[in-house]
């Protein structure tokens, strides 16, 4: 049942090892990525959707407590130190890192609360207080993109009829692929027409310089390694490849020295595993989510909440590093979507 995910992992592994200029580092990167996938699928096999939500909520309570502790120990370090900014970062490196952490976990906790409500169970006070604190932290981050990532999937979590009407569940894979590609095309063609709307939220039509970067990346990838990429996680390690991106920008500008990613999940994948890898990813996403009406509703809720959030997040941010919680959650979501029937090892029973 997970064959399509295994296929994608195999494509990434084989492609990366064949094209990389750094075989030792590439092997480590591929092993880490594969281990993340296997761990995600192991969790899907042994925990149902409700338990997965519970584990994430419990982990986020710990994260919130650690954030408060860090604030007490180093109060001057929890806000951005860059000139002209005073955005909350907690103990993470940037406001966007912190905001994405709070954004996705707020969403998944609210989804868990809906499950508990359906079972007429009361939410523990510690989870409610943790959620409130995370909401305040998210506002302090002043990261509007993370809030936008939260809105659309949150509306579906709260008002969707996925439990009562399984036949009307969303085709998650098709939506993900279609809107992700459509966003890139729109951003590169007609987005400047919407400058007045972006001005209302304090942004510009270049998405803070992302669009010129995307155009240059596309130009680089059309000319070199179009179908194979540079190896998973290796593009930004390759000095020649990075130099080709930088040459379109002033040497003294941020983009002329930036090595922190494409700020778009699909472009980042293209750079690393080429069009073959992107095609394998799209195939895995679409096939794994076919037949959503046959999924256990709590598992579907996890898949829907995370895939919809990750879709919007991936429009303007990078992700899918070899081992990070966003990558782990993605393959838990895809694995849950594959798990249409209860087969294999018996799931552990949820005990409150």
What label would you give each PLM region?
Residues 107, 111, 154, 303-352:
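Transmembrane alpha-helices of multi-pass inner-membrane enzymes
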Residues 86-91, 169-170, 184-216, 237-239, ...:
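Flexible juxtamembrane loops connecting transmembrane helices in multi-pass membrane enzymes
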Residues 69-73, 140-141, 158-203, 219-223, ...:
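A membrane-periplasm/extracellular boundary helix in multi-pass inner-membrane enzymes
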Residues 121-126, 155, 159-162, 168-171, ...:
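Hydrophobic transmembrane alpha-helices and their immediate junctions
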Residues 53-79, 93-162, 287:
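Alpha-helical transmembrane segments of multi-pass inner-membrane proteins
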Residues 201-215, 219, 223-273:
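Long extracytoplasmic/lumenal interhelical loops at the membrane interface
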Residues 1-14, 48-54, 113-125, 293, ...:
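Transmembrane signal-anchor hairpin modules in multi-pass inner-membrane enzymes, especially those
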Residues 2-13, 22-45, 55-58, 65, ...:
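Aromatic-anchored transmembrane helix interface
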